[in-house]
C-alpha cells in the first residue's frame, strides 16, 4: 500500500524531529516530594507515574488521528543518590534497575478496560484489607490507573475543543472501557504503552498485535464502519506514532528500543491464527518503512507462500525485519522447559528475540552471556600447556569452564530484588487478583543466558581436534606461542587455521559436532544451577546481543571474560559472529548450508532464543522471482528445523553514504 500524502508528510516530520520543540527538561522532583511525604518504594513508583502523566499536556496536531507526544525528556529518579544508598543498605538483596523487556497482556487490558481493572483492584483490596503489603500495592496500582484515565480525559477535552469529535469519542471510550472500534483500540494502545515508558521502564514490546486487535477491526469491517484502505491508514499512523518518542527510549543507540510485534502463529488452542490483520501489518510496515515497530513473524514449514513473499518484500527494505520464529521448534521447546502448552502457543518475543509469554512472565531474559570462545581458549591453553594426551581432556576442561562461567553469572542474581512496578503490574495477568506487584513474580520467572561466539568457540575446538590431536601436524608449543604473539610472526599458521580447518556454517558434521557439543554442555550447566532464587530456572539461548563486540573488546563493568587471540586464527579484538552466524571471514557454501548447520542445535534444550543471522546483498531481492527465492529460503529455515532467523539486506554504498550523510538515511 502506498502512504497517503497526509501520512507521508507525517512520517517525514517525525523523521525530521519537527515535534521536538514540544520537549523540555523540567521533570517532577519525585525524590524530594516522596521524601517529604515519607513514601515507600512502591508509593514512589506510583507517584512517578502520576506526576509524569500529569506533566504531559495534550498535544494534537492537525490531521492526527492517533495522538500522544511525549514532552518530558527525562524520567526522574525515585531517590536522591544519598537516600538511595541509605535505603539500599536496608535491603536483604541486590536491587536491579527498572523492570523491562517483558510484555503486557495488551489483549486483556483492552478487552476489559482500565475501569474494570480498577474495580478488580479495589475488590482485592477489600478482600485483603488485613494485608498491609497488598493494600499498599493495590492503592498504588489504582493511583496509576487514575493518572492514565486523567491523561486520556485531558486529551479528549482538547480534541473536543479543536472540533475533533471523532478523536474525542475514541478517547472517551478507551482505555477506560473496551473499545468499540479499531481506531479507539489503536488510540488506547498508544496511550497505555506510552505510559509504561513514562513510568521508567524500557524495551516495552507490543506482543501479538494482529491477534488482539483483529476483533476490533473485524467488527468495524463487518458493520461497514471501516474499509481496508481506511484500516491500513489507521494502522500506518499508529506505526508512525511509535517512532515519535523512540529517540528518548534507552537502547536506541544500538538500534533496539524493544518495540517488537509478533505476527501469525497459532492461538492458545493450537488453531491457525494468521488473519487478515497479519497480512495488513506486513504491508503497512513496508509502506511506513521506519524502525518501529520491529516485526516478527511466526512460521512453520507449511506457512502460506504468499505470506512469506509479503514478508520478503519487507526484508528487501533493509530494516532488519521481519525476524522469523519457527513454531515447530519454539513451542515444543518451551513445553519441554516447563511451560504450559496454551502459554507456549501464545509466545511472543522480548525486545530482541527472547521468547516470552505476554502477561504471564516476569522473566529476566538477559542476565549475561557465556563466552564460548573464552571457554574454549582457556581449555586449549591450559590443556596444551599441561600436555593433555587426548582431545577429550580439552573438552573436559572446556565443559568445566562453561560451568564456571554460568555459575559466576547466576550466583549473584539469586539475591536479586526487582523494584516495584505498580503501573506495569496493572497490565499483567495476576497482580490485581493476588495483591502482589509483578516484581514479586508471575507464573514464569526464569532467567535467560546468551551463548555467545558459538562459531568461534567451535572452530577453535575443531582446529585443535584436527591439527593437534588427529593429524598431529601442529605442535602445541607453536600454537601457544602464536596465540601469545597474536600471530605476529606466525602468519602462515594463522592462514592454515583460517583456511584449511573445517568450519561451522558449511553443514560439515565434524565441525558442527563441536557446535552441538558446546550447546549441550551449556544447557547442562544451566540445568545444574537449579532454582534461580525466584522460583524459575536458567534458560540457555543462542543470541549475543552486543556481546559479540564486548567479549572481543571489553567494556566497563563487563562480568564476562574477554578473550585474546583464539585458535581459529582470530586476531585480538576481532569481533565474533552475531547470534548464530559463521565466524566473520569464513567462506561458506551458501545460506542453506548455514541453516543446516544451525538446525543441529538441540532446541528442545536451548529455549531463550537467538536467530540465525544471514546477510544478503540487496541485489538478491531484485525482481519478483527474487522474492520467491527468499520466501523459499524462509521455508527451508523452518523445514530443516532451525528455531529463529533474521535476514539483513546489505548495500555497502548506502551504508557508507549513511555514515557521511545520516540526515538523508533516517529510515535506517
Put a short name on every predicted segment:
Residues 1-141, 169-177, 181-668:
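Conserved catalytic cores of very large enzyme subunits
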Residues 162-165:
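A conserved hydrophobic secondary-structure block that centers on an alpha-helix together
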Residues 152-159, 210-214:
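Extended amphipathic alpha-helical scaffold segments
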Residues 141-144, 148, 152:
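Low-complexity, highly charged intrinsically disordered N-terminal segments
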Amino acid at each position: 500500500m502506498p502512504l497517503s500524502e497526509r501520512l507521508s508528510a507525517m512520517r517525514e516530520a517525525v523523521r525530521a524531529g519537527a515535534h521536538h520543540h514540544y520537549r523540555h527538561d523540567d521533570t517532577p522532583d519525585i525524590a524530594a516530594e516522596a521524601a517529604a511525604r515519607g513514601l515507600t518504594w512502591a508509593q514512589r513508583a506510583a507517584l512517578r507515574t502520576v506526576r509524569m502523566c500529569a506533566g504531559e499536556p495534550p498535544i494534537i496536531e492537525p490531521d492526527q488521528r492517533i495522538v500522544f507526544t511525549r514532552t518530558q525528556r527525562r524520567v526522574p529518579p525515585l531517590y536522591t543518590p544519598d537516600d538511595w544508598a541509605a535505603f539500599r543498605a536496608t535491603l536483604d538483596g541486590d536491587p536491579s534497575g527498572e523492570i523491562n523487556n517483558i510484555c503486557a497482556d495488551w489483549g486483556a487490558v483492552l478487552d476489559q478496560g482500565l475501569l474494570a481493572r480498577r474495580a478488580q483492584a479495589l475488590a482485592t483490596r477489600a478482600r485483603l484489607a488485613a494485608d498491609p503489603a497488598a493494600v499498599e500495592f493495590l492503592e498504588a496500582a489504582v493511583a496509576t490507573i487514575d493518572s492514565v484515565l486523567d491523561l486520556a480525559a485531558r486529551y479528549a477535552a482538547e480534541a473536543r475543543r479543536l472540533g475533533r469529535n471523532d478523536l474525542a469519542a475514541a478517547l472517551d471510550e478507551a482505555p477506560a472501557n473496551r473499545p468499540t472500534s479499531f481506531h479507539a483500540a489503536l488510540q488506547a494502545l498508544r496511550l497505555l504503552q506510552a505510559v509504561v515508558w513514562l513510568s521508567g521502564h524500557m524495551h516495552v514490546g507490543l506482543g501479538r498485535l494482529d491477534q488482539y486487535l483483529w476483533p476490533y477491526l473485524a467488527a468495524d469491517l463487518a458493520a461497514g464502519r471501516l474499509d481496508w484502505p481506511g484500516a491500513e491508514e489507521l494502522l500506518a499512523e499508529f506505526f508512525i506514532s511509535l517512532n515519535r518518542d523512540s529517540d528518548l527510549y534507552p537502547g536506541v543507540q544500538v538500534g533496539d528500543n524493544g518495540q517488537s510485534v509478533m505476527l501469525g502463529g497459532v492461538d492458545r488452542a493450537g488453531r491457525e491464527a494468521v488473519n487478515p490483520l497479519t497480512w495488513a501489518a506486513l504491508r503497512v510496515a513496508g509502506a511506513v518503512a521506519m524502525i518501529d515497530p520491529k516485526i516478527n513473524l511466526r512460521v512453520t514449514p507449511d506457512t502460506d507462500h504468499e505470506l512469506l513473499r509479503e514478508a520478503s518484500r519487507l526484508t528487501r527494505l533493509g530494516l532488519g525485519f521481519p525476524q522469523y520464529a519457527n513454531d515447530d521448534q519454539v513451542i515444543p521447546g518451551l513445553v519441554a522447559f516447563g511451560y504450559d502448552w496454551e502459554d507456549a502457543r501464545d509466545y511472543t518475543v522480548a525486545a530482541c528475540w527472547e521468547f516470552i509469554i505476554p502477561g504471564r512472565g516476569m522473566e529476566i531474559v538477559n542476565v549475561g552471556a557465556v563466552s564460548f570462545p573464552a571457554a574454549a581458549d582457556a581449555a586449549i591453553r591450559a590443556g596444551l600447556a599441561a600436555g593433555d594426551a587426548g582431545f577429550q581432556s580439552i573438552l573436559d576442561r572446556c565443559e568445566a569452564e562453561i560451568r564456571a562461567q554460568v555459575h559466576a553469572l547466576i550466583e549473584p542474581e539469586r539475591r536479586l530484588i526487582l523494584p516495584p512496578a505498580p503501573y506495569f503490574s496493572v497490565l499483567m495477568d495476576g497482580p490485581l487478583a493476588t495483591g502482589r506487584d509483578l516484581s514479586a513474580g508471575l507464573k514464569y520467572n526464569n532467567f535467560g543466558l546468551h551463548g555467545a561466539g558459538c562459531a568461534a568457540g567451535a572452530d577453535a575446538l575443531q582446529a585443535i581436534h584436527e591439527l593437534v590431536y588427529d593429524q598431529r601436524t601442529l605442535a602445541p608449543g607453536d600454537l601457544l606461542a602464536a596465540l601469545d604473539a597474536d600471530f605476529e610472526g606466525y602468519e602462515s599458521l594463522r592462514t592454515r587455521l583460517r583456511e584449511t580447518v573445517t568450519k561451522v556454517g558449511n553443514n560439515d558434521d565434524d565441525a558442527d559436532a563441536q557446535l552441538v557439543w558446546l550447546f549441550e554442555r551449556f544447557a547442562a550447566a544451566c540445568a545444574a544451577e537449579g532454582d534461580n532464587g525466584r522460583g524459575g530456572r536458567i534458560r540457555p539461548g543462542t543470541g549475543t546481543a552486543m556481546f559479540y563486540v564486548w567479549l572481543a573488546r571489553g567494556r566497563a563493568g563487563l562480568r564476562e571474560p574477554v578473550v585474546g587471540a583464539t585458535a581459529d586464527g582470530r586476531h585480538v579484538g576481532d569481533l565474533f559472529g552475531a547470534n548464530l552466524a559463521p565466524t566473520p571471514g569464513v567462506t561458506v557454501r551458501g545460506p542453506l548450508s548455514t541453516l543446516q548447520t544451525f538446525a543441529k542445535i538441540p532446541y528442545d534444550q536451548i529455549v531463550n532464543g537467538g536467530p540465525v543471522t544471514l546477510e544478503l546483498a540487496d541485489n538478491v531481492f531484485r525482481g519478483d522471482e527474487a522474492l520467491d527465492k527468499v520466501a523459499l529460503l524462509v521455508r527451508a529455515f523452518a523445514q530443516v528445523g532451525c528455531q529463529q532467523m533474521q535476514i539483513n539486506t546489505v548495500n555497502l554504498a548506502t551504508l557508507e553514504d549513511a555514515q557521511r550523510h545520516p540526515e538523508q538515511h533516517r529510515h535506517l
